Regions:
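Beta-propeller-forming repeat regions
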Residues: 1-129
Length: 129
């Protein structure tokens, strides 16, 4: 998502990240040496993050665990990782005044949506549905 989430006139970037993600300041998120690919090339294990980047500089400003967590891959409707790796994102004015962003995971069998606020340099989980 690229949007001005805090109303300062400059867009932030909010996206799913993983171990080894490097920002514009060469700061690495998580473990730079991790490789969670299975024999088929799928990543069905390991940490996932949500990171907010400064849209002007590309530097990470906040990182938290991605919600909802992957958990049991089969609970999403298949066992090979297709449905657990279906993602969506949207902007919503949940308070009627300021933008929040929605992240989502899942397809068909199980859908989960999560709302986040970026306020005063802080990433806050609003709700999970």
């Amino acid at each position: 998502m690229v949007y001005d989430f805090d109303g300062d006139g400059k867009a932030e970037i909010a996206c799913k990240t993983a171990d080894g993600t490097k920002d514009a300041a060469n700061t690495i998120i998580g473990n730079p040496n991790a490789d969670y690919r299975n024999s088929n090339g799928y990543i069905l294990d390991g940490p996932e993050y949500l990171t907010v980047f400064n849209g002007q500089t590309g530097e990470a400003m906040a990182t938290t665990n991605y919600l909802p967590p992957r958990g049991n891959v089969s609970a999403w409707g298949d066992s090979y990782g297709n449905r657990v790796d279906r993602f969506i994102a949207a902007v919503a004015y949940l308070d009627g005044q300021r933008p929040s962003f929605i992240t989502g995971r899942g397809y068909y069998t199980r859908l989960v949506r999560v709302a986040w606020d970026w306020r005063n340099g802080t990433l806050k989980h609003r709700w999970t549905f």
